[in-house]
């Protein structure tokens, strides 16, 4: 059966610090905190995008480009999702009722976004949908990048050139960075600091 190629936005919202958080803390409380934060991301980001699946510490979403007529809507979604995530994480920490390592380590968690625009195919097997394609592979490869190494940021949004071009967003407020991957070559990306945007939204 031939599957139709679709074009649209691909978005990955990935909790930074997840691996060390789980490895160094009590798994029961870590699971509760992470589930709560993942639910927060899904609820917010799912208001505009279709959630494809949860990938451990990440939420993978997609949306046909026609469903987002203005690029600023996607940028606002990233802002609002990050705002909600940070607020909920701080609330969790403030209301923690124990001194376990998991509760103490909540402030080490952060959120990064990878945004791309490209082609994908929706595969359905036994009622389970999955996205396939080179651009799907690319966005997942981009989650392993040099942003934190180059900037010190752990909460950020990384957009590919294709993503920003489709959004028609001014690139002046972003830091340009090139990533390179085997079989995919060099990828032009643009990054913004979500901590700074969070402070701006909070009026700090």
Regions found by a protein language model. Name each.
Residues 148-204:
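Intrinsically disordered, glycine/charged-rich C-terminal tails and inter-domain linkers
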Residues 11, 110-116, 156-162:
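Extended hydrophobic secondary-structure segments that form protein cores and membrane-embedded regions
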Residues 123-143:
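Catalytic-core segments of nucleotide cyclases and related cyclic-nucleotide turnover enzymes
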Residues 63-69, 114-129:
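Catalytic strand-loop-helix junctions within cyclic-nucleotide turnover domains
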Residues 1-80:
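Catalytic NTP-binding/metal-coordinating core of nucleotidyl cyclase/transferase enzymes
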Residues 16, 118-120, 162:
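Alpha-helix/helix-capping structural signal
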Residues 32-47, 65-113, 139-143:
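Alpha-helical scaffold within the catalytic cores of cyclic-nucleotide enzymes
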């Amino acid at each position: 059966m031939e599957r139709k190629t679709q074009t649209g936005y691909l978005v990955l919202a990935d909790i930074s610090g997840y691996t060390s958080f789980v490895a160094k803390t009590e798994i029961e409380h870590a699971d509760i905190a992470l589930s709560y934060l993942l639910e927060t991301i899904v609820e917010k980001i799912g208001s505009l995008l279709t959630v494809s699946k949860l990938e451990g510490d990440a939420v993978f979403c997609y949306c046909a480009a026609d469903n987002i007529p203005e690029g600023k809507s996607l940028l606002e979604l990233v802002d609002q999702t990050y705002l909600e995530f940070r607020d909920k994480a701080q609330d969790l920490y403030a209301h923690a009722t124990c001194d376990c390592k998991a509760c103490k380590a909540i402030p080490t968690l952060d959120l990064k976004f990878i945004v791309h625009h490209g082609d994908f195919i929706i595969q359905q097997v036994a009622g389970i949908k999955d996205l396939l394609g080179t651009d799907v592979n690319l966005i997942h490869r981009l989650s392993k990048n040099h942003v934190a190494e180059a900037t010190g940021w752990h909460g950020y949004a990384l957009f590919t050139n294709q993503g920003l071009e489709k959004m028609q967003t001014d690139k002046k407020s972003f830091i340009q960075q090139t990533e390179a991957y085997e079989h995919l070559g060099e990828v032009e990306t643009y990054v913004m600091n979500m901590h700074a945007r969070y402070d701006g939204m909070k009026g700090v």
